[in-house]
Every structure is written in C-alpha cells, then in structure tokens.
C-alpha cells in the first residue's frame, strides 16, 4: 500500500459523515511522504519544532504550534507520543511513529475526538508495523 493510500483511505476517510480538512504523513526529517491536496505548505523549522516537542514535551506550549499560515494553541496530549492543538472551531493532532509524523487537521463539524481517533489509529498501526 502506498503512503498516499494511507492518507486518502485512512486519514481522509469519513467518520459519522465528516472527514478531516487535510492530512499528511511526514518523515522525521520533514520530507512529505504523502499529503491530501489541502494540506498547508509548511516551513522546515515548523516541523523541526514539532519534533522538538516530542523530544522535550512542553516546548511548544508557550509559543504555539505553527503549521503553514496557522498557529495552534497546544492543548493536552501524550508527552512524546501525541501533540494536540486548537484554533477556533478546529484543530490539529500529530502522532509520532518510529519514522514519521501522522498529521490530521480538522474543522467543525468534525470533533477533536474524531480527529484524534483517525490520526492515532493509523499512527498506532504504523508503530506496530515498525514504521
């Protein structure tokens, strides 16, 4: 299965009639493995800061999580495993695997819990596959 298939069929899938606004799988080096068409263009340092927060939990809390043109307020997550952010009625979930970051961005009517479920389910699967 290609990385694009994981994005198209597993991250952008429909959940209770809703789906993520955009999603991507990005290597720890910041290289995009696959992304949805609406995934924002980001700066290398934005991905570096996300990785740093996994290594140093709480790093992003005072400055926010930036991805492309959007700044997310970092909210509860799982230190070293999941970062969650909020912006208005939407937000972001980032799950770290051994080699990649699984990223999902949502807006209402999708809920934070639905986004977390979609992103973390694929992330957990990739971890079990050694990826």
Swiss-Prot record:
GO cellular component: a single term: cell cortex
Span of the annotated motif Involved in PIP2 interaction: 81-97
Modified residue annotations for Phosphothreonine: 111
Pfam families, alphabetized: Profilin (PF00235)
PTM field: Phosphorylated by MAP kinases.
GO biological process, one term: regulation of actin cytoskeleton organization
An example Gene Ontology molecular-function term: actin monomer binding
Misc: The variability of the residues taking part of IgE-binding epitopes might be responsible of the difference in cross-reactivity among olive pollen cultivars, and between distantly related pollen species, leading to a variable range of allergy reactions among atopic patients.
Protein name: Profilin-6
Species of the source: Zea mays (Maize)
């Amino acid at each position: 299965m290609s990385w694009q298939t994981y994005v198209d069929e597993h991250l952008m899938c429909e959940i209770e009639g809703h789906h993520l606004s955009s999603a991507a799988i990005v290597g720890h080096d910041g290289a995009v493995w696959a992304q949805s068409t609406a995934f924002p263009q980001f700066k290398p340092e934005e991905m570096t800061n996300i990785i740093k927060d996994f290594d140093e939990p709480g790093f992003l809390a005072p400055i926010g999580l930036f991805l492309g043109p959007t700044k997310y307020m970092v909210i509860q997550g799982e230190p070293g495993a999941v970062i969650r952010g909020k912006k208005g009625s939407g937000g972001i979930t980032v799950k770290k695997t051994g080699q990649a970051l699984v990223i999902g961005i949502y807006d209402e009517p999708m809920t934070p819990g639905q986004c977390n479920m979609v992103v973390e389910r694929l992330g957990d699967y990739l971890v079990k596959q050694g990826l």
